[in-house]
Amino acid sequence: MTLQYSAVGIQNESHMATSIDDYWKDLERLQTSIAYSVWNCSLDLPVQLVSVSEGGIGGWCLGGGEEHLRIYNEVVPEIPGKETEFLGEICKQFNIFLIAQMVAKVPDLMPDRIFNVAFIIDPNGELIHTHIKTSFYQKETNTAPSDIWDVYLEKYGDDPEKLHDALYPVAKTEIGNIGTLICAEGSYPEAARGLAMNGAEIIYRSQYPEPWMGNNMNQIQNQSHAIFNTCYVLAPNIGGIYMPGGEDFKFSNGKSQIIDYRGQIISEYLSGGEALVSAIINIDGLRDFRLRGQWQNLAKDMRVEEYKVIYDAMMAKGGIYPKNLCMDEPPFTEEDQVELVKHQVNKMVKLGIYTAPKNWEPYKIKESVAERIKKTEAEL
């Protein structure tokens, strides 16, 4: 029998968590949403895969500096924990794989740091995949792997294959090989390629906020990931998020999509609010195309030596983004993130990558931020 089934992206409304109770409000609502999606969308083919967007469980719960430590201690859940166990019971009830995300602590990796984590739970209720978000937009004050790079080197050594598996894990399941990207990660083609090179056939790439949904940047990125890597892209977004300040204070998002391995949109919901997208995922068709196609199964033709020199050259120049920024201190505050952006722009101009307009002067950087960056550079 051909391996094909229905997949669902749930576009739910959620809460920007100020306590663990807000996570549970979203979890309990999702129980109903998942039940409906399986009940209705199985009229096409049985639903075997359900996904929930970044922010769909507890929002983003942001805070740098001392606020980061308070949120760690008082708000965010732990993965694995009661929340993933609750979702595991739902997966067992409906015999589905579930992809979701939470801002959470992962004490086995590093205490006192908050991570943005995508995860997959199988039909037996088991947590089979976790992925730590590797890059952020400037309003997110969580911890990425490169922020604690020495922890990764201690855990995995400098073996590139082990680090590749740790940074871009892929769950090899009976319904296909699934990798996960979270929001800003999908802004970088390398992240999706990292999953593809570990065998991904389905890439979950969760939401972008506005204005980058309405101007189609998110869609263009996701279609590109699908084409470049011959993968399905499952891209749910939140339907809206209740901000701290009252149940009537809500921002909408929307535009959830599913894209096939040829880059075609096969399901979408353009508006905000609670909804879902669903499409038939034909894994055997994808596998057949990868094996019999001559050209657009592009990964087979990667001349890796030619691309490797790009990053070798950047490393020889000291790298781009400073690593190990959160080994000794929590992530920057939003205010200090702006200072970090200034530093990065100055660096790109200095390296000759960006060309500045006439009469441009390098940005002045807040001294405390400059010192923290300088400390990481001194350790190179």
Predicted features by range, described:
Residues 20-23, 43, 97, 167-170, ...:
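Eukaryotic scaffold repeat domains enriched in small/polar residues
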